Every structure is written in structure tokens, then in C-alpha cells.
Amino acid sequence: MTNIIETVDLTDLVGLCATDDVAEGEILRVKLPSGHALAIYCVNGEFFATDDICSHGEASLSEDGSLDGYEVECSWHFGRFDIRTGHACAMPCEHPLRSWPVTVEGGQIFVDVGAHPV
């Protein structure tokens, strides 16, 4: 099952990668046209996107983090975030990550860039 947004302004969708580029239980770093880095996750066949940089420090979640179910752990201070919502789940992280609406179409992963200013 994929995480699909029902109503999306198609002008705000940006293609990031193919679904085959993100292995089950893995994290892939991608960049928006603005250069802003996102982390793409695949859990149980669903795809999720958050900002790639931990809200507590400057660690890349895709490069240094680890995925455990629906939570990503930052390797710097072991804070955790729910990849579905961006919610901070473990200290020292107090501020959520931005999570991005994901659409999967034709084997491609898109995010709604209208969801957040970058």
C-alpha cells in the first residue's frame, strides 16, 4: 500500500525518484529543485518524505540515521522522529521534522512542494 494524497495541485508536485530507488527499510537522500534536501523512506511498501536534516543538529538522517519501523533515529544524539508525521519521539529532539505529502504514480515518487516554503 502506498501513501497517496487524494487532492493535490499537480503544479506543486515534484518528481524525486523511482520507487525502485528506495529499498524496503532504507532511506534515500534527494534534493528539490531549490537544493533543499529530503529523506525518502520505504516502510511496508509505503513511501514517506521528511526534511533530511535533524531538527536538533545538522546531521543528515539519510546518510547517518537508521530506520526502525516508522521511526528514524539520528546518529548524533539518538533522537527519534516518526517518519509519517515528523513528530519528535525521543529526546533530545523536541522540534518536529517537516514531513512532505507523497504521491506515487507510475513507479515514480512525487512530493507536494506547495506544502512548505523552501
Curated annotation (Swiss-Prot):
InterPro entries: Rieske_2Fe-2S (IPR017941), Rieske_2Fe-2S_sf (IPR036922). PROSITE patterns: RIESKE. Belongs to the bacterial ring-hydroxylating dioxygenase ferredoxin component family. Pathway: Aromatic compound metabolism; p-cumate degradation; acetaldehyde and pyruvate from p-cumate. Residues 14-111 form the Rieske domain. [2Fe-2S] cluster binds at residues 54, 56, 74, 77. GO terms for biological process: catabolic process. The keyword Iron applies. This is p-cumate 2,3-dioxygenase system, ferredoxin component. The keyword Acyltransferase does not apply. GO terms for molecular function: 2 iron, 2 sulfur cluster binding; metal ion binding. It holds the Pfam family Rieske. It comes from Pseudomonas putida. Its cofactor is [2Fe-2S] cluster. The p-cumate 2,3-dioxygenase multicomponent enzyme system is composed of an electron transfer component and a dioxygenase component (iron sulfur protein (ISP)). The electron transfer component is composed of a ferredoxin reductase (CmtAa) and a ferredoxin (CmtAd), and the dioxygenase component is formed of a large alpha subunit (CmtAb) and a small beta subunit (CmtAc). Component of the p-cumate 2,3-dioxygenase multicomponent enzyme system which catalyzes the incorporation of both atoms of molecular oxygen into p-cumate to form cis-2,3-dihydroxy-2,3-dihydro-p-cumate. Functions as an intermediate electron transfer protein via a specific interaction with iron sulfur protein components (ISP)(CmtAb and CmtAc). It comes from the Bacteria. Induction: Induced by p-cumate and repressed by CymR. Keywords: 2Fe-2S, Aromatic hydrocarbons catabolism, Electron transport, Iron, Iron-sulfur, Metal-binding, Transport. Binds 1 [2Fe-2S] cluster per subunit.
